[in-house]
From Swiss-Prot:
<dbReference type="InterPro" id="IPR015422">
    <property type="entry name" value="PyrdxlP-dep_Trfase_small"/>
</dbReference>
<comment type="pathway">
    <text>Amino-acid degradation; L-threonine degradation via aldolase pathway; acetaldehyde and glycine from L-threonine: step 1/1.</text>
</comment>
<dbReference type="GO" id="GO:0006567">
    <property type="term" value="P:threonine catabolic process"/>
</dbReference>
<dbReference type="InterPro" id="IPR015424">
    <property type="entry name" value="PyrdxlP-dep_Trfase"/>
</dbReference>
<keyword id="KW-0456">Lyase</keyword>
<protein>
    <recommendedName>
        <fullName>Low-specificity L-threonine aldolase</fullName>
        <ecNumber>4.1.2.48</ecNumber>
    </recommendedName>
</protein>
<dbReference type="GO" id="GO:0008732">
    <property type="term" value="F:L-allo-threonine aldolase activity"/>
</dbReference>
<keyword id="KW-0663">Pyridoxal phosphate</keyword>
<comment type="subunit">
    <text>Homotetramer.</text>
</comment>
<dbReference type="GO" id="GO:0005829">
    <property type="term" value="C:cytosol"/>
</dbReference>
<dbReference type="InterPro" id="IPR001597">
    <property type="entry name" value="ArAA_b-elim_lyase/Thr_aldolase"/>
</dbReference>
<dbReference type="GO" id="GO:0006545">
    <property type="term" value="P:glycine biosynthetic process"/>
</dbReference>
<feature type="modified residue" description="N6-(pyridoxal phosphate)lysine">
    <location>
        <position position="214"/>
    </location>
</feature>
<dbReference type="Pfam" id="PF01212">
    <property type="entry name" value="Beta_elim_lyase"/>
</dbReference>
<dbReference type="InterPro" id="IPR015421">
    <property type="entry name" value="PyrdxlP-dep_Trfase_major"/>
</dbReference>
<comment type="similarity">
    <text>Belongs to the threonine aldolase family.</text>
</comment>
<dbReference type="InterPro" id="IPR023603">
    <property type="entry name" value="Low_specificity_L-TA-like"/>
</dbReference>
Length: 382
C-alpha cells in the first residue's frame, strides 16, 4: 500500500449502509466460532471445517460436491471455465449479468470465450424464447462461436427467475447438449422469498455458485457446487487461478454459523424493508427500473431525472450510505435508517423536478464519485 495513502475511518456498523448487501459484518458468534476452527491445509483437502461447509452447502443444493472459493467472481469464472473445453465457443447470459458486466472481462481472458449478452424481452428475466433467438448452434458453420453454456443469475437485480421458466430452459439445454450454470450469489434470497428449496433449484443446473457473504452475513467466500467430476476439474482451475487457500477453516466456520442460523428470517426481513421502500416510491411517483422482488430497489434515474450524486449527498445528509440509484437491503439495516433513506430519496426526487439531470453516458452501479462522497459521511454538509 502507498505509505502516503490516507486511511478511511474504521468501519463499525452496516446499519445505515445501503450500498450493497456485501457490507454486512460478521457477528460476535461468528468471530467466536473462528477461534475454534480447524487449521488443516484446505489445498490438500485436510481442513475439516472447510470440508464440512463444502459438503453441507452441496447437500442443501442437492449436488454431489462443493468447493470453497474466496469470492463469487472466482467461483463463477472457475465454473464457466470448467464447463468449456475447446474454443471457439460462447456463453449466453443476460446483458446485466455479473459474469459479463462486473468480473473484469474474466470470460474473455480466462476462458477465451465470446459472450452473447441478451436483453430480456419482458424487461426482467430471460425466457426460453429469448435464449433460442440468440443461441448459436454448433452446426458446422465456421463463422460463429457455438453456444456451449447458458449462464443465468438468480436473483438478478433483485428479480426472482420464475421456477417454471427455469424448468423450460433446463429441458431445452438437455435436448441441445448445453451446460446450464447459475450465478447464485443471491439464490438464498430467491429461495427465502419464493419458498423454492435450494435443492429444487439445484436439480435444474449443472453448477451453482453460492455466495456466503452478501445477505448471509459471513465475512467472505462462495461455494461452487456440482457433480464430483465437475468439482474435481474445477479444483484444478482454482489452483491455476491462485484461488487455493490454506487455512480456510476460520472463514468456513464463520460461514457455517450464518447458514445454521435463521437465514430465511434474515432474508425476509431485508425483503420486507425493500418492499416498503418500493411502496413509498410508488406513493410519491418515484419510478423504479424493475420489480423489487427481494432485497433491491432500483430507482429509475433516467425517468426521474435524478442526479445520482445529489442522491448520494442527500443520503449523507441523513447519515446513510448509498451508491447511485441502487438501494440494497440486508438484515443489518435498521428501521431508523429505512425511514432516513426514504426522506433522502424523496428530497433528491423533489430536487430533480427543479433541476432535472440528463446526462448521456454510461450508467454505472459502482460510481467512483459516489464512493468518494461516502468517505465524507462525517463531515459533509448539504
Amino acid at each position: 500500500m502507498n505509505q502516503d495513502m490516507e486511511l478511511p475511518e474504521a468501519y463499525t456498523s452496516a446499519s445505515n449502509d445501503f450500498r450493497s448487501d456485501t457490507f454486512t459484518t460478521p457477528t460476535r458468534e461468528m468471530i467466536e466460532a473462528a477461534l475454534t476452527a480447524t487449521i488443516g491445509d484446505a489445498v490438500y483437502q485436510e481442513d475439516i471445517d472447510t470440508l464440512k461447509l463444502e459438503q453441507h452447502v452441496a447437500k442443501l443444493a442437492g449436488m454431489e460436491a462443493g468447493m470453497f472459493c474466496v469470492s463469487g467472481t472466482l467461483s463463477n469464472q472457475i465454473a464457466l471455465r470448467t464447463h468449456l473445453t475447446q474454443p471457439p465457443y460462447s456463453i449466453l447470459c443476460d446483458y446485466r449479468a455479473h459474469v459479463y458486466t462486473h468480473e473484469a472481462a474474466g470470460l474473455a481472458i480466462l476462458s477465451q470465450a465470446m459472450v452473447t449478452p441478451v436483453i430480456p424481452s419482458n424487461g426482467n428475466y430471460l425466457t426460453l424464447e429469448d435464449i433460442k433467438k440468440h443461441y448459436i448452434p454448433d452446426d458446422g458453420d465456421i463463422h460463429g462461436a457455438p453456444t456451449k453454456v447458458i449462464s443465468l443469475e438468480n436473483t438478478l437485480h433483485g428479480i426472482i427467475h420464475p421456477l417454471e421458466e427455469l424448468v423450460r430452459i433446463k429441458a431445452w439445454c438437455m435436448e441441445n447438449d448445453l451446460r446450464l450454470h447459475c450465478d447464485g450469489a443471491r439464490i438464498w434470497n430467491a429461495s427465502a422469498e419464493s419458498g423454492v428449496p435450494l435443492k429444487q433449484y439445484g436439480e435444474l443446473f449443472d453448477s451453482i455458485s453460492i455466495c456466503l457473504s452478501k445477505s448471509m452475513g459471513a465475512p467472505m467466500g462462495s461455494i461452487l457446487v456440482g457433480s464430483h467430476k465437475f468439482i474435481k476439474k474445477a479444483n484444478h482451475f482454482r489452483k491455476q487461478q491462485g484461488g487455493g487457500v490454506r487455512q480456510s477453516g476460520m472463514m468456513c466456520k464463520m460461514a457455517m454459523v450464518a447458514i445454521q442460523g435463521d437465514w430465511k428470517g434474515k432474508m425476509r426481513r431485508s425483503h420486507r424493508m425493500a418492499h416498503e421502500l418500493a411502496r413509498f416510491c410508488a406513493e410519491h411517483g418515484i419510478p423504479l427500473e424493475s420489480p423489487a422482488d427481494t432485497n433491491f430497489v432500483f430507482l429509475d434515474l433516467q425517468k426521474s431525472k435524478m442526479n445520482p450524486d445529489v442522491l448520494v449527498k442527500k443520503s449523507l445528509k441523513y447519515g446513510c450510505k448509498l451508491m447511485g440509484g441502487r438501494v440494497s437491503f440486508h438484515y443489518q439495516i435498521s428501521e431508523e435508517s429505512l425511514e432516513k433513506i426514504k426522506q433522502a430519496i424523496l428530497e433528491a426526487f423533489e430536487y430533480s423536478k427543479k433541476n432535472p439531470y440528463d446526462e448521456n453516458g454510461p450508467t454505472k452501479i459502482y460510481r467512483s464519485e459516489s464512493a468518494d462522497a461516502v468517505g465524507e459521511i462525517k463531515t459533509y454538509k448539504y
